[in-house]
Amino acid sequence: MTSHLCCSNYSSPLPELLVCLHTEGSLTALLEVKAGQPLRVERSFEGYRLLSLAQKKQLGMQGAALSRPRLAWVREVQLYGNDELPWVQAQSLFPLSSLQGSARRLQQLKSTPIGYVLFKRSRTLPNQRFIKHTVDGWQRQTLYNWYGRPLLISETFLPQFCEKQLDI
């Protein structure tokens, strides 16, 4: 019943979830506090994919760049706290143009939470955030400006997280 409160088709998320959706800084750090342990990351996909038109627009591409095929390094993971079921489903999009120099390490994350890398030197990063409801739950899509490079990260809060961790 409580998962319906968090992840049903309400016009806005409950206040308990709003804290997670709008947290500035590392979501990884917030989730690890809630779990009382490091997050476990399971990768479901990691590799190159063509960006969709919507993704190109979200990444700030304009004009002729929208009509050209663009590759990105895509990482899709499930984040586990202290439960058997995942708490968050996440997708990270790194346009190839963003993977220059030391940013290439973003292709080598394996089971490391991305928050460990993005927020290593700074507690917050310049970003634009969009919140929406999906069939899987409430999602935050954040376009980060990481050292002048755009990175798009989508994080969907799954029913298990809402039910067990938000006390709703």
From Swiss-Prot:
GO terms for biological process: pyruvate biosynthetic process; ubiquinone biosynthetic process. Pathway: Cofactor biosynthesis; ubiquinone biosynthesis. Its EC number is 4.1.3.40. The keyword Lyase applies. Pfam families: Chor_lyase. Removes the pyruvyl group from chorismate, with concomitant aromatization of the ring, to provide 4-hydroxybenzoate (4HB) for the ubiquinone pathway. This is Probable chorismate pyruvate-lyase. It comes from Psychrobacter arcticus (strain DSM 17307 / VKM B-2377 / 273-4).
